[in-house]
Every structure is written in structure tokens, then in C-alpha cells.
A protein has these predicted regions:
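Conserved signature/switch motifs of ABC ATPase nucleotide-binding domains
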Residues: 141
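Helix-to-loop junction immediately C-terminal to a conserved catalytic motif
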Residues: 49
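Catalytic Walker B motif of ABC-type/P-loop ATPase nucleotide-binding domains
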Residues: 146-150
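Conserved H-loop
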Residues: 175-181
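Conserved ABC ATPase "signature" region
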Residues: 99-116
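Short coil-to-helix segment of the ABC ATPase nucleotide-binding domain corresponding to the Q-loop/switch region
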Residues: 79-86
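Conserved ABC ATPase signature
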Residues: 121-125, 129
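The feature captures the beta-strand-to-loop junction immediately N-terminal to the Walker
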Residues: 34-36
Length: 222
């Protein structure tokens, strides 16, 4: 469970981003945040993650086991893609055993990551491949709450369909929560069951279920 109550935030106590934000996300929800650049999407994710602290109000989280995938995927340049796959687990002190490796291989197949790509170093990987490795890193942590900032924007539609199948099955079966940012409304409709449309830091429109987006007027859509 995540609850934001009358949350306000300003950078350097001058540039106000949020002044009175209220939001409730239940455990097991898959939520997308959609909006134009500069409307506060990443700031909202940083507040939920605890990277930033609100200047007023309160943020409640029932579970502190959070995995946060930022826009710039962390891949060590001297490690292969396969070795980088387990970086987040290592940083959390999670043993990289045969069970973890088998889980990684199963996800790799669904993500359409070829064995040849796993032997490459980050500088040899495409943007989409780096994103898939970063997403795999994050999912292997087995966190309760996944926060993802633009995780799919360089991933082709065929791979995205496979990722959707895995994410839905994995998250729903284990009752985990995912919140992700996207500029692409099609990705939001494909992957989430709730959509938060941010017109501005003060205007948040929630669509639940996501399929109701299609019934909005053109002025209400992104």
C-alpha cells in the first residue's frame, strides 16, 4: 500500500512541483504514469522511492522492499550483459545461486534476449537491449514494489508483448506492485490496470480501469 496525503514538494524551496497531492495505490496494482515532459512524473516516482522528501504532507508505504529502475540503466562497463544481470541482487546481498540463474534464463527467453547478446559488454548493446537487461536486473531482486522510469521506450513491440505476459503473470501471482512512467499511452494501456494522467503538477486524472481511457474525450486524452 502507498498513500500520499496532501504532499507538497519544491526544489530548493523555490520551484514548486507539487502543492497538495493525494494518491492511493493498493498492493498488487500495476499503475502507469503518463504525461508530457516537465509535469512532475519522475519527481513523483522519486518521492515514492524516498530519493526525495516531501516539503509537506505524508507518504505512507506498507512495504520498504523497493526496487527502482531509473531512466539511465546501471550497467558496469567491464562486465558482460550476463554478469550485469545480477548486479542489483549483489548490491542487495541476495545470493546469486542456481535458482537465480535459472530464473534469469527463463525471463531472458521471454524478453527475446539472445545468448550471443549476453556475452557483449554494455558499449556493444543497443538501447533496447540495455533496457531489457536493466528490467531483468530489477525483477530478479524479488522486491515488493517496483518503480520504473521509462523502462520500455527503446523496446520493440514484439518484445513488449512478451514482457507484458511475464509481468502480469509474475506480479499478479506474487501480489507485487509496479508503478512505471511512460510517454506512450499504448504502453500504458498494454501493461497497466490503472493510468494516472499528469497534465501538470496540480492536475492528476486517474483512469481505473485503464481500458476506460478509450471513452475519454479528445481534450482529456494525452
Amino acid at each position: 500500500m502507498i498513500e500520499l496525503q496532501n504532499v507538497g514538494f519544491a526544489y530548493n524551496n523555490k520551484h514548486t512541483v507539487f502543492s497538495n497531492l493525494n494518491l492511493y495505490i493498493d498492493r498488487g496494482d500495476i499503475v502507469s504514469i503518463v504525461g508530457n515532459s516537465g509535469c512532475g512524473k519522475t519527481t513523483l516516482l522519486n518521492l515514492i522511492a524516498g530519493v526525495l522528501l516531501p516539503s509537506k504532507g505524508e507518504i505512507k508505504k506498507s512495504d520498504k522492499n523497493i526496487a527502482y529502475l531509473m531512466q539511465d540503466v546501471t550497467l558496469l562497463p567491464y562486465r558482460t550483459a550476463w554478469e550485469n544481470t545480477f548486479l542489483a541482487c549483489e548490491l542487495r546481498g541476495i545470493p546469486v545461486d542456481n535458482i537465480q540463474k535459472q530464473a534469469a534464463k527463463e525471463i531472458l527467453d521471454l524478453f527475446n534476449i539472445e545468448t550471443e547478446a549476453l556475452n557483449k559488454f554494455p558499449k556493444e548493446l543497443s538501447g533496447g537491449m540495455k533496457q531489457r537487461i536493466g528490467l531483468l536486473q530489477t525483477l530478479l531482486t524479488d522486491a515488493s514494489l517496483f518503480l520504473l522510469d521509462e523502462p520500455f521506450n527503446a523496446i520493440d513491440i514484439n518484445a513488449l508483448n512478451s514482457i507484458k505476459l511475464y509481468i502480469w503473470e509474475y506480479l499478479i501471482k506474487s501480489n507485487k506492485t509496479m508503478i512505471f512512467i511512460t510517454h506512450n499511452i499504448d504502453q500504458a494501456l498494454l501493461l497497466s490496470d490503472r493510468i494516472l494522467i499528469m497534465r501538470s503538477p496540480t492536475k492528476l486524472l486517474e483512469i481505473k480501469p485503464a481500458k476506460e481511457y478509450c471513452s475519454l474525450s479528445p481534450d482529456e486524452r494525452i
